[in-house]
Amino acid sequence: MSVSDPLGDMLTRIRNAVGRKKTKVSTPASKLRARVLDVLQAEGYIRAYTQSEFENGKAEIEIELKYYEGVPVIREITRVSKPGRRVYVSVKSIPQVANGLGISILSTPKGVMADHEAREQNVGGELLCRIF
């Protein structure tokens, strides 16, 4: 089945799995999804993820969700820039999420990174999603 927004699909799978208190969720693999998961893992929102390849050439990513005392670490995860409406921000206009308690993930010319990294490297880009 063709998905028009692969990153949005992955975020929705994570949101649904967190709502059902699942420990793992799987999604088709792509480079962008893996880079976003790298940021989520580095920031402590997921435990880990593993990528596996099937005989037919398709790959899948299995994500281990993180809970603290039974409460999901990810409270809210939303897509900002969508295929029909792209959202680009300069380094000066990168928004803070929940007064700095959450993060935004950006796709920049220097790679996919969290908002605080983009500010440090003085680079803007496409605002992919917000996590709190």
From Swiss-Prot:
Q: Name one GO molecular function term.
A: structural constituent of ribosome
Organism domain of life: Bacteria
Kindly indicate whether the keyword Zinc belongs to this entry: no
| Keyword Phosphoprotein listed | no
GO CC annotation terms, alphabetical:
ribonucleoprotein complex; ribosome
Q: Name one GO biological process term.
A: translation
Known Gene3D superfamilies for this protein?
A: 3.30.1370.30, 3.30.1490.10
**Keywords recorded for this protein, A-Z:** Ribonucleoprotein, Ribosomal protein, RNA-binding, rRNA-binding
Q: Which NCBIfam families match?
A: PRK00136.1
Q: What is known about what this protein does?
A: One of the primary rRNA binding proteins, it binds directly to 16S rRNA central domain where it helps coordinate assembly of the platform of the 30S subunit.
Q: How does this chain assemble?
A: Part of the 30S ribosomal subunit. Contacts proteins S5 and S12.
Q: Which family does it belong to?
A: Belongs to the universal ribosomal protein uS8 family.
> What's the protein name?
Small ribosomal subunit protein uS8
Organism this protein belongs to: Brucella abortus (strain 2308)
Q: Which gene encodes it?
A: rpsH
